[in-house]
Amino acid sequence: MRVLIVINQSVEERDNSYWCASNVYDILRRFTCLGELSLCADRYNAKKSHLLMDRELTGVVAKNHVTYINKIRLRMSQQDRAIVSQCVSQSDLVISHGASYDVFRIARNQGKKFMSFVVSCIWDGYWNHGWLGKLVAPYIFLLTRYTVNHSDYVLYVTSDFLQRRYPTQAKYNCGCSNVRITTLDENTLNQRLAFIRKWDGRTMRIVTMAAVDIKYKGQQFVIKAMHQLKQQGRTDIHYYLIGGGSRDYLERLAKEYGLESQLHFLGKIPHDEVFSVLDTMHVYVQPSLQEGLPRSMVEAMSRGLMCIGADTAAIPELIEPQFVTRRRSATDIARLLASVTTEQLITQAHRNFKEAHHYEDTVLDQRRNDFFDKVKNDILK
């Protein structure tokens, strides 16, 4: 079966092969069981590309099966529609990463089966991008909602949130996170508990994994919370940020509040090295204004970290209600950080490590592959 994936991500052509970011590779790898993959993606042409484009696509997408289009913002250009239309004509199944209305219409016009891959809330994404984003959010939200509702198949990354916001009449749909966690080892939990028991009860290392130049990721609210705690005499909380992007805005904010010595930028870290950093932290914070199901939070849970998160998207699906903060609330974050105890860290280590088992590769792959089998059988019957 020939499968076309139209993805709102970037691919780079380098040394006679194609390269993409690890998270994009993971997405594409999971679709290989459906058949022969072709890809429509944005062309990546930035410096230091090896830091981001770190996985070769050979074996997932054949060299002559990558076609470049511009990233889809509001609507596709006429030129890109023509390119996608040509690719669709050679496919049996069209998958749109993000549920693009334009890709949906092209597939429908050619009588091709269409799958929406719903990874985040488009409303939150646009609404949190200033006045222009708020202006177009209702329009793009309704288009996306229509697309998902009328798709032949839908794959969600949440268990509940995106399903409620973007319901579907699809023949088959599945809720399955795109987190990648290998089999969990009880030694990880034991090491976490030993780490907690050595804690002095004051000095705390907290961490967020997200790009540092995207404001809707919310790191600024954690910095403001630290400022509130500093005013209360707490200067022993250190905030570590894992992720690429310009640091200018957050550095200015930290300087304004006199928190430069408490803010630590670790940059982009290879995925296989992230866990060793998480093992040195006490609390993971996910203050986002837009998410699907945050894989970084699940990864933190798999290391037994206590997690705090905003009431955004599927974050409340992952953690207990008392650790969910109001969106944009530095006060809520400060209150929770100030009240952390050793007993709380131990309880949450057990709870979160157990919850992370639901997101192991073997569990999710089985659920996803069962869904893919239904899709294949429906198309090939």
Question: Which residues make up each language-model segment?
Answer:
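Aromatic "clamp/platform" in nucleotide-sugar-dependent glycosyltransferases that forms part
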Residues: 287-289
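Short alpha-helical donor nucleotide-sugar binding micro-motif in glycosyltransferases
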Residues: 88, 268-269, 276-281
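Nucleotide-activated donor-binding/catalytic signature segment of Leloir-type glycosyltransferases, i.e.
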Residues: 251-269
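Short hydrophobic beta-strand element within catalytic cores of glycosyltransferases
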Residues: 297, 305-309
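Conserved donor-binding/catalytic core segment of Leloir-type glycosyltransferases
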Residues: 4, 195-217, 223-226
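Conserved acidic donor-binding segment of nucleotide-sugar-dependent glycosyltransferases
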Residues: 322-331, 338-343
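A short, active-site helix/loop in glycosyltransferases that binds the activated sugar's phosphate group
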Residues: 141-193
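Glycosyltransferase donor-sugar binding loop
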Residues: 209-214, 238-251, 267
